[in-house]
Amino acid sequence: MSDLSLLQCTNLSKRYQDGKLSTDVLRDVSFEMSSGEMMAIVGSSGSGKSTLLHVLGGLDTPTSGEVIFKGQPLSTLSAAAKADLRNRELGFIYQFHHLLPDFTALENVAMPLLIGKVPTSQAQDKAREMLAAVGLEARSHHRSSELSGGERQRVAIARALVNSPSLVLADEPTGNLDQRTADTIFELLGELNVRQGTAFLVVTHDLQLAGRLNRQLEMRDGQLQQELTLMGARQ
């Protein structure tokens, strides 16, 4: 693993067992990602993309293989240590924003900091800063139910970045948005990558979206291809 390596997974496999029936969702996946890199993994639904993100984020355990983050094998960490790592080092963005509906945009964005025991005033100041970065400073006291779909996703991005994570794992982050809003969101991710040096690993079935990132790999039937064949991708 190089000095600039942020994330490495080696011979990663994931098998789900249901009685006598077994399903191999990930099969011998290996790749390395550098600090500050923006990388896309393209694949159709059911190809194993989301499972891979869950394993990389320590939300699921591989059947075999290893995930190494900043030189630390995840297999050596307790559940509490993984949770702490996720809160300090990782950000998550999903197709559906998963905002708390009864909380304001400011409260949603501040939540990871409060979980990390950051003082409330400091957490709110940082949350305001991130909402300003995504162009929503004026909407900070609106509940998520009062925001448009694009605004909610921008709040989710601000929440993912409020802890200044080294890596953001994004699962179809624009899949629920119209093309114009999706374009705006991806311009924002690029700006934050440059401004904060945040690395982004984005899984998507949208080839046009993936083409905006530094590197593209393809997931097909649980295996990672080092070159795109475009099978199952949407152009």
From Swiss-Prot:
Its main location: membrane. It is an enzyme of class 7 (translocase). It is a peripheral membrane protein. GO terms for biological process: lipoprotein localization to outer membrane; protein localization to outer membrane. GO terms for molecular function: ATP binding; ATP hydrolysis activity; transmembrane transporter activity. GO terms for cellular component: plasma membrane. Transmembrane segments: none annotated. Residues 7-234 form the ABC transporter domain. CDD domains: ABC_MJ0796_LolCDE_FtsE. Pfam families: ABC_tran. It is found in: Cell inner membrane. Keywords: ATP-binding, Cell inner membrane, Cell membrane, Membrane, Nucleotide-binding, Translocase, Transport. Gene3D superfamilies: P-loop containing nucleotide triphosphate hydrolases. The keyword Translocase applies. Belongs to the ABC transporter superfamily. Lipoprotein translocase (TC 3.A.1.125) family. Part of the ABC transporter complex LolCDE involved in the translocation of mature outer membrane-directed lipoproteins, from the inner membrane to the periplasmic chaperone, LolA. Responsible for the formation of the LolA-lipoprotein complex in an ATP-dependent manner. NCBIfam families: LolD_lipo_ex, PRK11629.1. This is Lipoprotein-releasing system ATP-binding protein LolD. It comes from Pectobacterium atrosepticum (strain SCRI 1043 / ATCC BAA-672) (Erwinia carotovora subsp. atroseptica).
